[in-house]
Amino acid sequence: MNSGLKWRKLGRVFCPTGETPWMQSHAAVPIAEHLHDDLFRIYFSSRDARNRSYTGSLIIDIADPTRVLDLSTTPVLAPGSLGEFDDSGAMATWLTEVGGRRHLYYIGWNLGVTVPFRNSIGLALASVDGSDRFVRYAPGPIVDRSMTEPHFCASCCVVPNGDVFSMWYLACTGWQLCNGRPEHKYHIRYAESVDGVVWSRSGEVAIDFANIEEYAISRPSVMRDADVWRMWYSHRGRSYRIGYAESADGRRWTRNDNKVGIEVSEHGWDSEMIEYPFVFDHKGRRYMLYNGNGYGRTGLGIAILEGLT
């Protein structure tokens, strides 16, 4: 186990400026997909004028990551039909390969009445033409509220792990009224699947609240190195920061937020908060995509791991 990480910010990659009706603002919850050579496709969640979430994509060269080479003109994934679990938004949260086909896990949004929203996890499969388009696996979610998780589930990370797939996912533990407004509380739990579709959940907590002020832990990003599992995630009491944890088996985690090695900037687009990390490797280097102020309203950025401190 190391004494600490050190990330160097490379800059902001992209921030929407109303390019299309479905991309009026936000570039939240980024995901990197390696295409070939140094080219990567970055998936992200944008919003339209009605505040509905869409999934879009762009392409960068990792050698010059703050220059966008291509930007999608149509959504990768759009909100579902009226009354479905994702009719208010379809926000990509993780991409992995299952049985030779790319599986895109996404957060489906429904607006609520007694509480502002309800989330669940949906699945879309890659189009057979190899493009960035995805088609829904089913009109309903694959992970939703249940008898033992009655509120909502959201952002997740899915990793092949021997004969199963491991999922770390956001689970809401409850809502309460604060000054007359409903406020949620959620942390990260663990689930397993043999096919990446049907998931077994036991309520096992992976990352729990550090103190009574903390109320939100989200967007896990897990890497398995030779000697340790590592997880990056968002956590907040007052405003979002990126956290870090280590594990010997991917199940029992030790939080080491003080070792994360990345903080808000003194000024600019990520000076108030940093959140929604996505960590990936390329040619022996480790990178992190992340969001800044406004939960993705100011765009997405990239950092590179420079080593241990």
Regions found by a protein language model. Name each.
Residues 91:
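Metal-dependent C-N hydrolase catalytic cores
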Residues 1-25, 29, 33-88, 96-151, ...:
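Beta-rich carbohydrate-recognition and catalytic domains
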